[in-house]
């Protein structure tokens, strides 16, 4: 039986921390779907199609990883793919408090829904999309924070 998971996020933009979690998930699961949330309510810096493209470029060459956009409930997206496991990255205790609430809410919507929490490596633990956006707004260098495949897209 194939073990599959979904790694959802806004990825505004995708960071080395996200990519780190994806690479860790690939070691555990046979198939990983990176699900890019439309998330209009978050007022993303980058458009939906741009974010999907950035994630696609970032995971090129990773076996058994695919990228899809979604604009519905995560649980509904998961059911449509017959996958009941989601991966979430944790950097700090504050992340866990938020993610635990989301995990419980998803489980309330679908009792078979499981959330697996993975930590990025220490060198990527401080990286967040918010930090990257802040550095970009101030014309700073984000080359150490994001996958090299998307660096040119961020500066464009």
Swiss-Prot record:
Its EC number is 2.7.7.3. Substrate binds at residues 10, 42, 74, 88. It is an enzyme of class 2 (transferase). GO terms for molecular function: ATP binding; pantetheine-phosphate adenylyltransferase activity. GO terms for cellular component: cytoplasm. Keywords: ATP-binding, Coenzyme A biosynthesis, Cytoplasm, Magnesium, Nucleotide-binding, Nucleotidyltransferase, Transferase. It catalyses: (R)-4'-phosphopantetheine + ATP + H(+) = 3'-dephospho-CoA + diphosphate. Pathway: Cofactor biosynthesis; coenzyme A biosynthesis; CoA from (R)-pantothenate: step 4/5. One of its GO terms (biological process) is coenzyme A biosynthetic process. Its cofactor is Mg(2+). It is found in: Cytoplasm. The record marks 18 as: Transition state stabilizer. ATP binds at residues 10-11, 18, 89-91, 99, 124-130. The keyword Lipid metabolism does not apply. PANTHER family: PHOSPHOPANTETHEINE ADENYLYLTRANSFERASE. Homohexamer. Reversibly transfers an adenylyl group from ATP to 4'-phosphopantetheine, yielding dephospho-CoA (dPCoA) and pyrophosphate. Belongs to the bacterial CoaD family. This is Phosphopantetheine adenylyltransferase. It comes from Campylobacter curvus (strain 525.92).
